[in-house]
Design a protein with these regions (language model features):
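Sec-dependent signal peptide recognition
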Residues: 1-8
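Electrostatic cytochrome c docking/interface patches
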Residues: 13-30
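The canonical Cys-X-X-Cys-His
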Residues: 27, 31-41, 113-117
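Short, non-ligating residues that shape and space the ligands of small metal-coordination modules
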Residues: 44-45
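Extracytoplasmic electron-transfer domains, predominantly the class I c-type cytochrome c fold
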Residues: 52-118
């Protein structure tokens, strides 16, 4: 009985969560290239295009957004995928002469971006 238990515990110690595999450098790079122009480096809607979209870019470090992130951990990824404001993001970029090359998002990219942004948001005051 001890050997199977030891084997199970050994196997469990090798299993890591998706967060353990997240590439924070990739997440930061994706954010810097694709999000910071509106949300700013600090995620507080301080980017040069933050007030040029309608509605204005939200501050992602507010208590309300932190609660939303806690209640729905996929909110960041779903915002990228679903673009709840229709074509607001591409329209804002186009109207301001910003060209962002197309990006074929991978599962790893979403994981990395989510992990990076969540970390910055949860550390902010």
């Amino acid at each position: 009985m001890k050997i199977p238990l030891i084997a199970v515990l050994g196997t469990l110690s090798l299993i890591q969560t998706a967060q353990d595999f997240a590439d924070s450098a990739n997440g930061k790079n994706l954010y810097s290239q694709r999000c910071a122009m509106c949300h700013g480096a600090d995620l507080k809607a301080t980017g040069p295009l933050a007030r040029k979209s309608s509605p204005p870019t939200p501050d992602l470090t507010t208590a309300a957004f932190k609660k939303r992130l806690a209640d729905y951990p996929g909110v960041i990824v779903s915002s990228v995928i679903l673009r709840p404001n229709g074509n607001l993001i591409p329209k804002t970029l186009q109207e301001n002469g910003v060209r962002v090359p197309p990006h074929a998002w991978s599962v790893e990219d979403f994981r990395d971006l989510n992990q990076y942004m969540s970390g910055v948001i949860l550390k902010s005051r």
